[in-house]
Amino acid sequence: MHPASVTTTSQDPCAPSGSCRGGRRRRPISVIGGVSFYGNTQVEDVENLLVQPAARPPVPAHQVPPYKAVSARLRPFTFSQSTPIGLDRVGRRRQMKTSNVSSDGGAESSALVDDNGSEEDFSYEELCQANPRYLQPGGEQLAINELISDGSVVCAEALWDHVTMDDQELGFKAGDVIQVLEASNKDWWWGRNEDKEAWFPASFVRLRVNQEELPENCSSSHGEEQDEDTSKARHKHPESQQQMRTNVIQEIMNTERVYIKHLKDICEGYIRQCRKHTGMFTVAQLATIFGNIEDIYKFQRKFLKDLEKQYNKEEPHLSEIGSCFLEHQEGFAIYSEYCNNHPGACVELSNLMKHSKYRHFFEACRLLQQMIDIALDGFLLTPVQKICKYPLQLAELLKYTTQEHGDYNNIKAAYEAMKNVACLINERKRKLESIDKIARWQVSIVGWEGLDILDRSSELIHSGELTKITRQGKSQQRIFFLFDHQLVSCKKDLLRRDMLYYKGRMDMDEVELVDVEDGRDKDWSLSLRNAFKLVSKATDEVHLFCARKQEDKARWLQAYADERRRVQEDQQMGMEIPENQKKLAMLNAQKAGHGKSKGYNSCPVAPPHQSLPPLHQRHITVPTSIPQQQVFALAEPKRKPSIFWHTFHKLTPFRK
């Protein structure tokens, strides 16, 4: 999550905070972001500004990248082979202001020349002067909590899906607008999405540049509100429109400059030092950890130079930067390689961080380069975040660009182009990261039979409890998990309701869903409510299911449509998970479950499926178009003992 400085324009007097939102006019408010500079020096200020909420659950205990505690603080120690060269020269960089006149006669610009002779197009001091607030420790938290305590609505847009089976965490999909209600913790914020309030990872969202007065329910899908918001924005007062467009342009320019500094620090602060220590790192290890980030750095430098040429410093709202994105849209494809490599980089880095020698080395690199207090894995996440931010920034810029503006058509085309790039990369990343959780889920199921779930599936679409009706009219309560290509049936343990037993599966490629109207079914001679059928294409065998509520049935019907659509999209895009990654995921899951206590018949006891350990980034692949059903929270329906014991010994109709 990139922090933000906050600037406000003139405002009218209003009633005390919280008394009359309609009477106060305090717009536009700009939240212009850069990079996280969290610290502990202003924690008390943050707490004082925070509006005390109602009783809330504790902040989730697990860490959320990029703020994982993998870097140990350096204590004085003797220099060794794991100490980066030049650590004894740590101090303020020697600054030289040089005048560079561009070939087209542009204005002078400052360059930063460090002790190694490398040159950058802007200096750290210039960044501080341009954005004094967000470069200060705790600047973003102070800015957000000031707005919240003043009664303002603060909204953020989701960069990625956040799917969770934890009631205390907020689930959302990429592009959703989330109202931020508390930002006292640097990793987890409290927010509202639709009608639910819970914790969510701060690094998963981007604050809106222009915080406008929104309806009480600020959360909505980005795609659904885009046209409506754009239409409203274009009817605003011209001066307000220009100011808001200026805010977005400045955010794009400022975040791009800070991003370049991050890339430079990674390449010069980490990679350069690692290559000098051949005894610690192999070429293959460095390729795994850093991927093609040096190529990204070269590309982004050229992209920023072109942006600077199109940037109008005197009147930023007149800047025409859309053409820059269109000219470089093919170059952004290099991010796909980096994002696909990123999960492997996290694994390799995590293995190295188990050794104190590497922890000290990477921390020394950070100190030598005078980088902000974020661990290396946090810096390596920034390219993944950046490529997902471009569509959100361009969407907001388009919102405040009139159709008469010279850059309107280019911005619109650039938004569509970058959205497609980000969607493809995000989808590939979600697929890779989902397989670990699916593997752990399978290991937790008692009595699993047949092929591994990953042999055919890579995505959990939906899950929930259904009643399966047999031809004899008997009911069987089962929990179903719908993956791409297959539907898995499980049964709860009679005594331990958190334990699941494998009962069978169905091939979704070989069945069709048929909706059943409420009333008496002639084929089954039963009165049915909230029912649907799965009919085999080959044998015409029919499986009848009933949901508890009409809403549950609607979710299953939508989930079936989503499953078919996702399978087709994967085939069109050639989306396949490498076999070696599937095998590695299963191997890691089996190792994690090895040695646990045994249950009935020496079967491993399954942990509660609702509390499976979270994945890196926690944006696994439950479908984004439907809410996840909390199946573990459902009450067990009452059944007559005689029916239960009569059917206890019978096999499920599902084919194993």
From Swiss-Prot:
GO biological process: cell migration; filopodium assembly; intracellular signal transduction; lamellipodium assembly; regulation of cell migration
One GO CC term, this protein: ruffle membrane
Location of the protein in the cell: Cytoplasm; Cell projection, Filopodium; Cell projection, Lamellipodium; Cell projection, Ruffle membrane
SUPFAM superfamilies named among the record's database cross-references: DBL homology domain (DH-domain) (SSF48065), PH domain-like (SSF50729), SH3-domain (SSF50044)
Region (C-terminal tail): 565-656
Keywords: Cell junction, Cell membrane, Cell projection, Cytoplasm, Guanine-nucleotide releasing factor, Membrane, Phosphoprotein, SH3 domain
PH domain residues: 459-565
SMART domains noted in UniProt: PH, RhoGEF, SH3
Residue segments, region ABR (APC-binding region) domain: 102-154
Source domain of life: Eukaryota
Gene3D superfamilies, per the entry: Dbl homology (DH) domain, Pleckstrin-homology domain (PH domain)/Phosphotyrosine-binding domain (PTB), SH3 Domains
UniProt keyword annotation of Membrane present: yes
Ranges of Polar residues composition bias in the record: 1-12
Inhibition and activation profile: Both the ABR and the SH3 domains contribute to maintaining the protein in an inhibited conformation by associating with the C-terminal tail. Binding of these domains to the C-terminal tail inhibits the activity of the protein by blocking a region that is required for its GEF activity.
Ranges where the SH3 domain occurs: 151-210
GO terms assigned for molecular function: guanyl-nucleotide exchange factor activity
Region feature (Disordered): 1-26, 85-115, 215-242
InterPro entries in the record: DBL_dom_sf, DH_dom, GDS_CDC24_CS, PH-like_dom_sf, PH_domain, SH3-like_dom_sf, SH3_domain, SOS1_NGEF_PH
Residue numbers bearing the Phosphoserine modification: S82, S118
Record's function text: Acts as a guanine nucleotide exchange factor (GEF) for RHOA, RAC1 and CDC42 GTPases. Regulates cell migration and adhesion assembly and disassembly through a RAC1, PI3K, RHOA and AKT1-dependent mechanism. Increases both RAC1 and CDC42 activity, but decreases the amount of active RHOA. Required for MMP9 up-regulation via the JNK signaling pathway in colorectal tumor cells. Involved in tumor angiogenesis and may play a role in intestinal adenoma formation and tumor progression.
Quaternary structure annotation from Swiss-Prot or TrEMBL: Interacts (via ABR and SH3 domain) with APC. The binding of APC enhances its GEF activity by relieving it from an autoinhibitory conformation, in which the ABR and SH3 domains are associated with the C-terminal tail. Interacts (via C-terminal tail) with PPP1R9B (via C-terminus). Interacts with RAC1.
Entry text on domains: The C-terminal tail is required for its GEF activity.
Protein name: Spermatogenesis-associated protein 13
Source organism of this protein record: Mus musculus
Gene for this chain: Spata13
